[in-house]
């Protein structure tokens, strides 16, 4: 029920203005009656104030001792004043393990703010996060590369219009090293390609460069060294990528059609150069036993019974990795009967 568009009547018949707190004299009466021992429901009926309103006023009074209403409308006053923020930062710096609610209690104990006007726990956490972001930004600025300069202009820069960066792309400035810095870095790289943190720290102090810049330089230098080594191998051995093709009738090759008893003597020097254990794995006997013409069929074992024990690799890879090794394609008993030979075996020359 509305009266004059301002006041309203509650269920008990009392008048109130919607959105406005109770007058101070009514609040004082509620507290006085509660001190005398009257129950909240009896106070509500006596003063014609809703039971919820009486309970909230008494609860706030018992908790904080404040009887006046909170701020009405307008902007909320800032509780985290500069003095409070400075004290929060000091407490967190002295005691990093403090929680936000402990900081709130300490602020109230020191008298910087009252119980009802202390910053909330979420507000204190917000202040702490902002302080951490400021510290991280400060350290990032301190650790940024000190020697940064734009790239050197080209000789034809006078006749060409300067080109700006493309929109939406960011370009990093290249670090220009002095001759002394480049010489010190290169000398340390020749000593070891993977320096530890102690060596990087000493090198950074000696060259007046940030440690991050030293670490990036070593990473780029290792990549450049790998490219140079790969180019050198390709230049020295242009045919390394091609598989070796050896005729079947060449010495040291035993064809699949030859019987074990008809092994030519030209094939035996290759086997004699191998370790006896290697020949034992492949042939079931050492070469001196298999070289006689009276060798029985039991003297030789098929390759597919012991192929898992032998090293297998392609010729191009092994020639690149170990130039001292030579590869020989084996055309006998590879992978079992009926399969084409395509595997190479290694032995020392």
UniProtKB/Swiss-Prot annotation:
What gene does the UniProt entry assign to this protein? Pax4
PROSITE patterns xrefs: HOMEOBOX_1, HOMEOBOX_2, PAIRED_1, PAIRED_2
- Please give the family membership noted in the entry: Belongs to the paired homeobox family.
Tell me a GO biological process for this protein. Answer: response to cAMP
Its job: Plays an important role in the differentiation and development of pancreatic islet beta cells. Transcriptional repressor that competes with PAX6 in binding to a common element in the glucagon, insulin and somatostatin promoters.
Q: Which GO terms describe its molecular function?
A: DNA binding; DNA-binding transcription factor activity, RNA polymerase II-specific; DNA-binding transcription repressor activity, RNA polymerase II-specific; double-stranded DNA binding; RNA polymerase II cis-regulatory region sequence-specific DNA binding; sequence-specific double-stranded DNA binding
Keywords (alphabetical) are: Developmental protein, Differentiation, DNA-binding, Homeobox, Nucleus, Paired box, Repressor, Transcription, Transcription regulation
Tell me where on the tree of life, at the top rank, the source sits.
Answer: Eukaryota
Q: One matching Pfam family, short form? A: PAX
- Protein species of origin: Rattus norvegicus
Chief subcellular location equals nucleus
User: Which Gene3D superfamilies does the UniProt record give?
Assistant: Homeodomain-like (1.10.10.60), Winged helix-like DNA-binding domain superfamily/Winged helix DNA-binding domain (1.10.10.10)
Which residue ranges carry the DNA-binding annotation? 5-131, 170-229
Q: In which tissues is it expressed?
A: Specifically expressed in pancreatic islets.
Q: Where is this region: Transcription repression?
A: 278-349
Q: Mind telling me which GO cellular component terms the entry cites?
A: nucleus
In Swiss-Prot or TrEMBL terms, this protein is called Paired box protein Pax-4
Which residue stretches belong to region RED subdomain?
83-131
Q: Where does this one sit in the cell?
A: Nucleus
Where do the record's region annotations for PAI subdomain lie?
Answer: 8-64
| PANTHER family to which the protein is assigned, alphabetical | PAIRED BOX PROTEIN PAX-4 (PTHR45636:SF8), PAIRED BOX PROTEIN PAX-6-RELATED-RELATED (PTHR45636)
